[in-house]
């Protein structure tokens, strides 16, 4: 995971005719994530997709036309090819760094990383970031994100204006959890993050649909439905105990059942559905602080 620059991008202002990017890529094997990991660079202006250009294996240069507009422009990378940007040059006009926006730490699993989205820019956190003017730090860990204490400590140590937590499906399989173990881990995770960010809104999203796991016990006897119930119960308990800046979003019905090509990860449309449901909640949490107003 550390070798894949999930969510790394370049945001800039200005109206150049184009930008040129000198780059180096390490691999053409996109692994289990597949084509959605990206084989191209692409520029967005605000939330409008602009020109894309294929990346080569090894060293190369790509030129991309940049559409005009007042919104920040964003260059997304071919993440799965493990790119390094060597240089970026504007043509036909100057560019400058985009203004700072509220910093959002988005912790989750491969769903947050963007698996089965059409491209890295199509992962639901990046759609939300563009639409809600947030500076997202994508902490999506494929095959992991089981509420590890080390991750909670890292989140607690980083500057943030908003934090989100969305994990659970990998606690049904891979490293199976019972409902009680999952609940204890989530509570510890939330306590550590809250200690580091006493006033920052935290949006907790319980596991989204996974048809094969909903009613099927894992090795410790827990169905995904049991883990989801435990997730929501822990968040509600923390709210009742005085965490007034903790938000709960039940995840079960956020994505339609036919939007999971591999049974686990939402497709491109499913990521749009997640962004549509979660974007306003994240914005509201940032602006209002407390779900109780």
Each predicted region: which residue ranges?
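Short hydrophobic segments within beta-strands
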Residues: 21, 107-108, 205
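Short glycine-rich loop/turn motifs that provide flexible caps or phosphate-binding loops at active sites
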Residues: 6, 107, 139, 167, ...
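Conserved aromatic-histidine-acidic binding/catalytic patches
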Residues: 9, 116, 262
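Short, charge-rich amphipathic segments
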Residues: 57-66, 80-85, 115-128, 158-172, ...
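Alpha-helical cap/lid subdomain in secreted, periplasmic
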Residues: 3, 13-16, 149-293
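Residue-level signal for short, function-critical loop segments
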Residues: 25-27, 110, 142, 169, ...
């Amino acid at each position: 995971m550390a070798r894949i620059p999930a969510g790394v991008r370049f945001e800039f202002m200005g109206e150049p005719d184009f930008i040129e990017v000198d780059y180096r890529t390490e691999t053409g094997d996109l692994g289990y994530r597949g084509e959605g990991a990206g084989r191209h660079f692409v520029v967005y202006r605000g939330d409008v997709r602009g020109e894309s250009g294929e990346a080569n294996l090894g060293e190369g240069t790509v030129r991309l036309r940049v559409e005009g507009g007042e919104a920040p422009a964003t260059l997304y990378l071919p993440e799965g090819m493990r790119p390094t940007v060597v240089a970026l040059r504007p043509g036909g006009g100057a560019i400058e760094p985009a203004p700072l926006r509220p910093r959002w730490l988005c912790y989750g699993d491969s769903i947050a990383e963007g698996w089965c989205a059409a491209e890295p820019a199509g992962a639901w956190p990046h759609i939300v970031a563009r639409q809600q003017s947030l500076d997202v730090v994508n902490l999506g860990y494929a095959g992991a994100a089981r509420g590890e204490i080390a991750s909670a400590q890292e989140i607690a140590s980083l500057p943030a204006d908003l934090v989100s937590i969305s994990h659970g499906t990998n606690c049904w399989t891979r490293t199976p959890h019972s409902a009680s173990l999952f609940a204890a881990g989530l509570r510890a995770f939330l306590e550590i993050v809250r200690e580091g960010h006493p006033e920052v809104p935290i949006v907790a999203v319980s596991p989204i649909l996974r048809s094969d796991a909903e009613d099927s016990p894992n090795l410790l006897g827990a169905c995904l439905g049991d883990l989801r119930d435990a997730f929501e119960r822990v968040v509600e308990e923390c709210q009742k105990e005085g965490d007034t800046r903790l938000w709960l979003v039940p995840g079960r019905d956020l994505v339609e059942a036919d939007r999971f090509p591999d049974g686990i990860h939402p497709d491109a449309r499913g990521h749009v559905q997640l962004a549509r449901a979660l974007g306003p909640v994240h914005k509201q949490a940032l602006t209002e602080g407390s779900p109780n107003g």
